[in-house]
Design a protein with these regions (language model features):
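Non-heme di-metal
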Residues: 1-212
């Protein structure tokens, strides 16, 4: 009887873990699809942003950021393929339009607004890849974790640069501030704490309301 009870409890535990892994896989897949198309919008927007800048050092910095976003897109696409999924075609078209719209705005919107807007968006991207790494862990995709954390760190670098640019402008004093991300090393430290935890909450992924 005791052995039977233990077996039933073990089976129930496996069932719960299996359901969590399946749910995490679904959420991870959707989040990666959002990230993949979001990177497309970012690339398009940064091309316009770069063209709007006169300062050569700033243009070179945007060039590096564009290359990072292209690498991120390639990495995310590979992960989607491993999950048996791919980009959402309708979302790709939508984010292409969004990116081109922002690109056009950068050419006429002055220096500060593109720097400010990019910083806000990059801050969100940090969290997006952190959540993806946690979902990958629960989804039993450990090979995804390090690349996702590395992408979060690169997005942290982007946010840090855009924040430094924006805060140097007088308009920064009157614009709403977004929350400053924790120190860069906290990305890995917080993931390690999540990994050690017995309670690993799962995120329900939703598309940003502005681009649904």
């Amino acid at each position: 009887m005791l052995t039977s009870s233990i077996a039933r409890a073990a089976a129930a535990h496996v069932g719960v873990d299996g359901a969590r892994a399946r749910f995490a896989t679904e959420q991870l897949t959707f989040l990666l699809q959002l990230a993949y198309s979001g990177e497309l919008a970012a690339i398009r927007a940064y091309l316009g942003h770069r063209a709007s800048l006169k300062d050569r050092a700033q243009r070179r910095a945007i060039d590096r950021i564009i290359r990072d976003e292209v690498r991120h897109r390639h990495c995310v696409l590979g992960q989607l393929a491993e999950l048996g999924a791919g980009p959402i075609a309708a979302r790709e078209r939508k984010m292409e339009r969004v990116g081109r719209g922002i690109s056009t705005f950068c050419l006429v919107g002055g220096w500060f607004a593109p720097m400010y807007g990019a910083g806000r968006l990059e801050a969100q991207n940090i969290r997006e890849y952190e959540v993806a790494a946690r979902l990958a862990l629960v989804a039993e995709r450990p090979r995804f974790v390090d690349p996702l954390l590395e992408m979060a760190e690169v997005e942290w670098d982007h946010e840090h640069w855009f924040r430094a640019m924006a805060t140097a402008h007088p308009a920064w004093r009157v614009f709403p501030k977004w929350r400053q991300p924790p120190p860069r090393e906290e990305i890995r430290a917080s993931f390690a704490a999540f990994e050690r935890s017995t309670d690993r909450p799962l995120h329900v992924v939703r598309a940003p309301w502005l681009v649904r």
